[in-house]
């Protein structure tokens, strides 16, 4: 079972890198708002939310709220599909995860998404400035 969970997580990360082709203004605004209010987590490692966590959050809050936790979108996919969203910056749907932003920068650089790379970098700078 454990190896299946690792495979599932690897596939989620692979799909997260799919065809994200645009920044998500709602996600960027929400992340900046959380950073301004101090709702930031600084764990030593990054944990992508599980599919179960995503599904539970989506069922409880709907697509509009779900969309706020992602810095990028794939405009080729419907807005009410998980495939539409990428570059998640939270591990708990409550806080901005600093290590998640670092992971986003790395993936965005690999995928040539300079606007997402820059947005995540500015967020990290804001977090670090509050220390």
What are these model-predicted stretches?
Residues 2-131:
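Extended terminal accessory/targeting regions
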């Amino acid at each position: 079972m454990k190896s299946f969970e690792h495979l599932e997580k690897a596939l989620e990360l692979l799909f997260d890198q799919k065809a994200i082709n645009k920044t998500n203004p709602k996600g960027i605004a929400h992340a900046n708002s959380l950073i301004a209010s101090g709702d930031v987590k600084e764990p030593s490692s990054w944990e992508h939310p599980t599919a179960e966590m995503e599904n539970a959050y989506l069922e409880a809050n709907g697509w509009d709220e779900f969309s706020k936790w992602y810095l990028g979108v794939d405009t080729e996919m419907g807005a009410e599909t998980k495939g539409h969203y990428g570059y998640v910056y939270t591990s708990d749907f409550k806080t901005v995860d600093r290590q998640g932003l670092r992971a986003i920068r790395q993936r965005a650089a690999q995928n040539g998404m300079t606007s997402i790379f820059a947005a995540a970098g500015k967020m990290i700078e804001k977090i670090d400035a509050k220390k």
